[in-house]
Amino acid sequence: MGADNQIDYIEFQAADLAATRKFFEELFGWKFTDYGPDYTSFTDGRIAGGFSRAQRRSTIASGGILVVFYHPRLEEARQRVIDLGGQISADIFSFPDGRRFHFTEPSGNECAVWSEDPNA
């Protein structure tokens, strides 16, 4: 059963489901379940979601929502994104009490990773 007034499921579109799945499996350890050739769902034990096959992508420039993940070691997460084939779309920058970077995954969806500012 879902919790009231909390995000329960998030759904993305992805042109290359296999590449997107592999990217997030290796980056965050998500577990996936395929539902045919055009849909795969994921869970990380706290939140669930899915990817449907489509040519559209979500970026800030296109007015898409920005999903922001947390990682305690920001530089390590950034390097992992690069190593797994992601592209850095905004390098590490500071904001009040934190730092973050933006990236696109293999299907072009833009996301971000943030961490506390170690100098704050």
Regions found by a protein language model. Give the residues of each.
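N-terminal beta-strand motif that seeds the catalytic metal site of vicinal oxygen chelate
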Residues: 1-21, 48, 65-67, 115-120
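N-terminal first-folded block
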Residues: 6-42
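Conserved short beta-strand elements that form part of the metal-binding/catalytic scaffold
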Residues: 30-63, 103, 110-116
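Conserved active-site tyrosine of GNAT-family acetyltransferases
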Residues: 20-24, 81, 108
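Short linear motifs in intrinsically disordered
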Residues: 28-33, 69-72, 90-93
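Vicinal oxygen chelate
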Residues: 1-3, 7-14, 58-120
